[in-house]
Amino acid sequence: MNLHEYQAKQLFEHYGLPVKNGAVCQSVDEVDLVLAQLSGDKWAAKCQVHAGGRGKAGGVKLVQDVEEARSFAEKWLGQRLVTFQTDKLGQPVNQIYFEETCDIDKEFYLSAVVDRASQKVVFIASPAGGMDIEEVAQNTPHLLHKVEIDPLFGGLPYQGRELAFKLGLSDAQNKQFTDIFMGLSRLFLEKDLSLVEVNPLVLTQQGNLVCLDAKIAVDDNALFRHKDLSALQDLTQNDAREAEAEKFQLNYVALEGDIGCMVNGAGLAMGTMDIVKLYGGKPANFLDVGGGATKERVAEAFKIILTDPSVKVILVNIFGGIVRCDLIAEGVIAAVNEVGVRVPVVVRLEGTNAEIGRQILAESDVNILTAQSLQQATELAVNAAKENSNGDFN
């Protein structure tokens, strides 16, 4: 679960991390009241969306007075911001965060993520902070410095000093950086985060370090023990289909193709999308029905896939390990009848009771194309998508 910047900075403040004063508005009428809470004669105005790249997309601006602030709010509130991290529709802007400014001398990058290979938290720091950190990682990886944090002990002061030294900070700034490092480490572990990012972490002309931006992602599996964080979730930032899928424990991610995919298992789902691309098709989604697929969940999966008007064919790829293929076959038939599917459905079953499942499909009166292999299923789906441009059976 992602947090907005203003929510992340509230957490930063709670953990003693240096941030500038800021306030959020949800309507143009609130702009004057919000700015009255802040000092200075100019402010940073930031669209609040769950995506990076806001600055390059025009979603961050330095406003010089109240009128310019109101104009920025009028332009963006209720609109959608498209960045390189969003789809072509972008994400809705429901809040604008206004923040006091500071005189920047240098910009740094600081983040922490879970490294599953080492089973530790990895802190990453770089002297090249700002909007182009992705290019830094690709073109000059030697500018990225890392330390591993044991989750049993948390961050240790010497590790913060080690990073500060590599960033070229002075002794006074070294102490500030170490305090920030320790605070982020406590925040990361105590709140079960999967990502925390400060980009940029700035050094002001007065010699102080300030977290000028903040990004936080919380591990969804830990939300049950963080009710305070769960209450901060902004469902408007989620794709409506993804939000609906969560209700039925379906893992769904919308894409921009025309071949709807329903698969059990995340790895098999990714492999299915790869082979669809290999055969010249375009997957419309990632959808993992999980190991405990039932008739009801299969039906809901069909409904969610078909809410995408661009879907011209549905490819069902099931490997029966935990789940039985005969139950999946019955679920597919029931779903097609219940939902009234009007696009071709291609089904590939393998594993437990696969032959029984294929027989059930063959003996049904539902127009379903069955395949003996994933390659055959993919070819059928790609060809059907090309032929079925109007979305109806031929």
From Swiss-Prot:
Succinyl-CoA synthetase functions in the citric acid cycle (TCA), coupling the hydrolysis of succinyl-CoA to the synthesis of either ATP or GTP and thus represents the only step of substrate-level phosphorylation in the TCA. The beta subunit provides nucleotide specificity of the enzyme and binds the substrate succinate, while the binding sites for coenzyme A and phosphate are found in the alpha subunit. Substrate binds at residues 264, 321-323. SUPFAM superfamilies: Glutathione synthetase ATP-binding domain-like (SSF56059), Succinyl-CoA synthetase domains (SSF52210). NCBIfam families: PRK00696.1, sucCoAbeta. It comes from Haemophilus influenzae (strain PittGG). It catalyses: succinate + ATP + CoA = succinyl-CoA + ADP + phosphate; GTP + succinate + CoA = succinyl-CoA + GDP + phosphate. Pathway: Carbohydrate metabolism; tricarboxylic acid cycle; succinate from succinyl-CoA (ligase route): step 1/1. ATP binds at residues 46, 53-55, 99, 102, 107. This is Succinate--CoA ligase [ADP-forming] subunit beta. PROSITE patterns: SUCCINYL_COA_LIG_3 (PS01217). Its EC number is 6.2.1.5. Keywords: ATP-binding, Ligase, Magnesium, Metal-binding, Nucleotide-binding, Tricarboxylic acid cycle. It comes from the Bacteria. One of its GO terms (molecular function) is succinate-CoA ligase (GDP-forming) activity.
